[in-house]
UniProtKB/Swiss-Prot annotation:
Transmembrane segments annotated in the record for this chain: none
Keywords (A to Z) from UniProt: Ribonucleoprotein, Ribosomal protein
HAMAP family from the UniProt entry: Ribosomal_bS16
GO biological process: translation
Family: Belongs to the bacterial ribosomal protein bS16 family.
NCBIfam families assigned: S16
Name of this protein: Small ribosomal subunit protein bS16
């Protein structure tokens, strides 16, 4: 099953996350199908903090992909 989740990048004490569509059997930071955006929790500017390709996420969800809890919360905040 395809799941849309966060993949951690960045370095120690400076996290940066990519929002990716991947197979749920793959590791968190492993191979993914498509990059759908990013989340930078440290950034102060809103434009550099989060970016989500909502059209692509909607496409994956129509194909049966599930959202992780964290991505679901980020998507809700991004739409506001």
């Amino acid at each position: 099953m395809v799941i849309i989740r966060l993949s951690r990048k960045g370095s120690k004490n400076k996290p940066f996350y990519q929002i990716v569509a991947s197979d749920n059997r793959k590791p968190r930071d492993g191979k993914f199908i498509e990059k759908l955006g990013f989340f930078n929790p440290i950034s102060i500017e809103k434009s550099k903090k989060i970016f989500i390709k909502t059209d692509r996420i909607n496409l994956w969800m129509s194909k049966g992909a599930k959202l992780s809890d964290r991505v679901k919360n980020l998507l809700h905040k991004y739409k506001k």
